Structures are given as structure tokens and as C-alpha cells.
Amino acid sequence: MSANALGMIIFAYLCGSISSAILICRLARLPDPRKFGSGNPGATNVLRIGGKLAAASVLICDVLKGMIPVWLAYYLNVPPFYLGIVAIAACLGHIYPVFFHFKGGKGVATAFGSIAAIGWDLSGLIAGTWLLTVLLSGYSSLGAIISALLAPFYVWWFKPEFTYPVALLSCLVLYRHHDNIQRLWRGQESRIWHKLKKKTEKTDKEIIQEAKEQEKED
């Protein structure tokens, strides 16, 4: 392993460790996403507690956390295999952030950003798969699961040199969704449309009050 590859792997992990969901919620004076809603510091949970603008901001930042390190590694001529390891490091940082007590999100947006840096054709297929699944089912988590399952096949078809690291990345995302898989199986997973409806029916004061009550229970 070259010094460039090792340096980019470390850099990617540190970038991933910056939890945009937590920071944006603090800036917007919203409840801590780790203690409210699903407890997951990601864009979907921020959508539940903070609305579309906050969720979109989190989504963009999470995508960039994966995209920027992989792009930089590519321009530093890091070999394809280690380029994939850089992508995995960014996702590991998002999932186990060193700056936030190793309690992070599920890595979907960061994984998407990493793959987008490898090829826009791949990112288009994955985004289309997620969107189609969500539109048909209403489940954001199911969209992530189906996309993670199909991503290695898309990569194998277009850029086979990245198949192995992307397969590892997909396994990581699927592992982080094991609770969602169980809830989907039991029919207990909430649909994304339900989250939006609940958000519009509540005032900001009610949301913050619920967060405080949940913190007391914890």
C-alpha cells in the first residue's frame, strides 16, 4: 500500500466521522437525531424531525463525505482496489464516527456518494433503483436495501475492477439495516409518506417537547 492510499483511507474515515445530521440539527436548533425519532442520525430521520430543508442539507453533506475522498484518491492515482477501500473507510466513519462516540448513521448516502465518484452511470442506476422502490413501496429503508443488493451487479457490468470493494460496501449497508429488515418482515416499518404527514401535523414546539420527554425517559 502506498503512502497516498493510506493517507486517503485515513482522510476518508475522518471525513465520514463528521456527522452532518447532528451538526445541522444543532445549528437549526432541532432535537438531537440520536435521541428522537428512529435514533438514526441520517437524512430520513432528520426529515421526520426537521422537515425537507434540513433533511436535504444532511443528504447533500453525507453524499459529499463519500464523494470528495474518492475523487481526491482518484486524482492521486490510487489503484482501483484501494479506491474502493477509501470508499469503505468513508462509510465506516459515517457509521462509527470518532468525533461522536462511534454512534453514527447507516451509510447509505455516503456509500452513494462514493459510488458516484466512481461513475455517474452507476450512481444514476442506483438512484433510479432507490427512487423506483420508494415510489412503489413507500419505504425508504427498502429502497436502500434493494439498491445495496443490486449495486455490486451494476458495478460488475460497467466497471468490474470495483466489484469486490463495492460488494463489501453493500454488505456494510445491509448489516446496518438489519433492524429495518426485521421491521419490514413484521410489517412494522413506517412509510416515508407517513413521516411527512406526521411532520406537517405537528408544530415545532410539539416536536421539541416530544424530544425532551423522550430524553427524560432515556
Swiss-Prot record:
GO terms for cellular component: plasma membrane. It catalyses: an acyl phosphate + sn-glycerol 3-phosphate = a 1-acyl-sn-glycero-3-phosphate + phosphate. The gene is plsY. It is found in: Cell inner membrane. Pathway: Lipid metabolism; phospholipid metabolism. One of its GO terms (molecular function) is acyl-phosphate glycerol-3-phosphate acyltransferase activity. It comes from the Bacteria. It is a multi-pass membrane protein. Belongs to the PlsY family. Keywords: Cell inner membrane, Cell membrane, Lipid biosynthesis, Lipid metabolism, Membrane, Phospholipid biosynthesis, Phospholipid metabolism, Transferase, Transmembrane, Transmembrane helix. Catalyzes the transfer of an acyl group from acyl-phosphate (acyl-PO(4)) to glycerol-3-phosphate (G3P) to form lysophosphatidic acid (LPA). This enzyme utilizes acyl-phosphate as fatty acyl donor, but not acyl-CoA or acyl-ACP. The chain crosses the membrane at residues 5-25, 53-73, 80-100, 115-135, 138-158. It holds the Pfam family G3P_acyltransf. Signal peptide: none annotated. Probably interacts with PlsX. Its main location: membrane. One of its GO terms (biological process) is phospholipid biosynthetic process. This is Glycerol-3-phosphate acyltransferase. Its EC number is 2.3.1.275.
